[in-house]
Amino acid sequence: DSGVIVYANSNFVNDTDASYFAALPFYFNGVDDSVDLSDAWISVMYAEFTGTSLSGASTSDFSRKGNPCGSAKEWCLVVDDTSIAAAGWVDSSNVSQYSIMGGSSMGAPQVSGMVALLSQAFPSHTPAQLTDRLLASANNAWFSPSGNTTFTTHGASIKHGYNNEWGHGVPDLEA
C-alpha cells in the first residue's frame, strides 16, 4: 500500500509471454488470500520506435526487442529503451563508465521516474491511482486492442484498451 512496483520484463524476443516475475500479479492474485499485486504493479516491455512521431504511428513503427506483455498485458507499458546512457561495466577490464545500453532494465527506471513525477503532481494519490493514471493515459492508438481495462480509482469509469503484445501502449505524461 505504500508504493508502485515497476518491473522490467525480460529481453528475450523469441519468448511468447511475459517473464514470470513481470507477470507475478497474473499468477498470485487471489491465491491463498494474497494481495492484489496488479493494483500498483507496472511491467515494462522493451521495444524500439523507428517512426518519427507517435501521432499516426502503427505497429510497423515498433520493433519488439524483448518479451511481449503477454500475461502482464493489463498492467504493461512499452518503452523505447534502445539507446540509454547508463553507468556500468563496459568490458572485462573492471572499469566502470557510462555506456549506451538497451533493454527493459533501462526502461523500468524511466517508468519509475514517470511515477515519481505523477506522485509529485498528485500528492494525495494512492499507489493504485498513480498506476491507473499512467496506464489509462498510455498511447495505444497505433495498435488494435484485444481487451479493455476499466479504471475506477478516480471516481469515474475510464476504459483503456490493451493487447497481448503491446499491453496498454506507450506512456503519455501529457495526456
Please annotate each region the language model reported.
Residues S2-V4, D39:
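A short helix->loop->beta-strand "cap" motif at the edges of active sites that frequently abuts
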Residues V6-S10, V44:
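Active-site neighborhood of phospho(di)ester-bond hydrolases with catalytic His/Asp-centered motifs
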Residues S10, G103-S105, G167, D172:
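Residue-level detector of functionally special positions within alpha-helical transmembrane segments
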Residues S10-V13, E48-T50, N139-W142:
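Acidic glycine-/aspartate-rich tracts in secreted/extracellular proteins
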Residues F12, S105-M114, Q129, L134:
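Extracytoplasmic, non-cytosolic globular domains
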Residues A18-A23:
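Metal-dependent catalytic neighborhoods of phosphoester/phosphodiester hydrolases
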Residues P25-A116, Q120:
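Extracellular S/T/G-rich loop segment that most often corresponds to the catalytic His/Ser-adjacent loop
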Residues A40-S43, Q120-A175:
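C-terminal subdomain of the subtilisin-like protease fold in secreted/lumenal serine endopeptidases
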